[in-house]
Amino acid sequence: MKLSAALLAIAAFANVASAQDCDTPATVSGYSNSALPDPFTFNDGSPVTTAEDWECRRSQILALIQGYESGAAPPEPESVTGTASGNSLSVQVSYGGKSITFNNSITYPSGTAPAEGWPVIIAYEFPSLPIPSNVATLSFQNSAMGKQDSTSSRGQGLFYDLYGSSSNASAMTAWAWGVSRIIDAIESTPDAKLNPAAVGVTGCSRNGKGALMAGALEPRVALTLPQESGSGGDACWRLSRYEEQQGSQVQTATEIVGENCWFSAGFDQYVNNLDSLPYDHHLLAALVAPRGLISYANTDYVWLSGMSSFGCMTAAHAVYEALGVPENHGFEQVGGHSHCQWPSQLDGSLNAFINKFLLGQDVSTDYFESNNQFNGVTWSESQWINWETPTLN
């Protein structure tokens, strides 16, 4: 049986969490808050004051996101086998007497691979941002892993062939699981010539939502690059609702659950009572901390909920600040280009984050900018953030 690094990390933390009596319920009864929930307060109301506290709080947030919207992570597979052939990595996964195989095409840099392998960015379907020539690209067909045709495709795809169509894992959880299995295969397949310690993940639009979820759920992802993910991605549910109330036609939680199966079926019961959620997507992004994260937003498309993305990532940035690594989290928001079309003016921040987190270079990644074009809706930090940012040592 292959024990993945992720499972080892979870098991190691479980011992620490148990010693600290870290309570991680899937839901919290009686919660009500119209503002963005405090990252630095435990479920029981006590404060998060140390970096060790944050590890427990992070586990709480992870449990809540799985309990309310993404669905539970499945049991670990019994085996994961990778086979490298030419420009392809085949991944075979077995569990409960069943097996699935999925193939991933790879574009390699020219020349001889470093001893540790090439850094690699896993792109959902295909990359819509420019990946440097010294970084490999692995194209992951996430829609085959968990179909996203409509709500009627719930429970369909390779993931559900293995774990059953009744699994409450959302399509995005299935995709994140697929990313984890790719990393397992990279770790165990030296012939793939990819560095498992230098893995990024990216996607745009609906796949951008998935890329952020993968970065949050899989701790071996060194750099997360969601692009124009909007509501359900780097935008917060509460803030998107507010934008709609102010007259903007944006994607909201109530709309999104009727559009597709990106979230678990259980999320439906909360979308008309968002104040009952003891988290929002600033806390989803906070799960990535202290690893590298930069998200890209496009204000030309009101549907993407621009104020919500900016405000949500502003709130998430507080966690990076508390951990002493604000430069590890970036945000860039511009207009003047089509949806999922990359504007060259963003090359600087993208290359900086790739150079730092995948190539190990000592470069500045101090990028957090917006054009503040929010269709007439104003972001007011004091309206949404009513908590202080501590220093977590």
UniProtKB/Swiss-Prot annotation:
Substrate binds at K209, Q251, E259, W303. Keywords: Disulfide bond, Glycoprotein, Hydrolase, Lignin degradation, Pyrrolidone carboxylic acid, Secreted, Serine esterase, Signal. Optimum temperature is 50 degrees Celsius. One of its GO terms (biological process) is lignin catabolic process. It is an enzyme of class 3 (hydrolase). Its main location: secreted. Disulfide bonds join C22-C56, C204-C340, C236-C312. One of its GO terms (cellular component) is extracellular region. InterPro entries: AB_hydrolase_fold (IPR029058), GCE-like_dom (IPR054579). It catalyses: a 4-O-methyl-alpha-D-glucuronosyl ester derivative + H2O = 4-O-methyl-alpha-D-glucuronate derivative + an alcohol + H(+). It comes from the Eukaryota. It holds the Pfam family GCE_fung. The active site is at S205 (nucleophile), H339 (proton donor/acceptor). A motif (GXSYXG catalytic site motif) lies at residues 203-208. Residues 1-19 form the signal peptide. Optimum pH is 7. Its EC number is 3.1.1.117. GO terms for molecular function: carboxylic ester hydrolase activity. The modification Pyrrolidone carboxylic acid is found at Q20. Glycans are attached at N103, N168. Glucuronoyl esterase which may play a significant role in biomass degradation, as it is considered to disconnect hemicellulose from lignin through the hydrolysis of the ester bond between 4-O-methyl-D-glucuronic acid residues of glucuronoxylans and aromatic alcohols of lignin. Belongs to the carbohydrate esterase 15 (CE15) family. This is 4-O-methyl-glucuronoyl methylesterase.
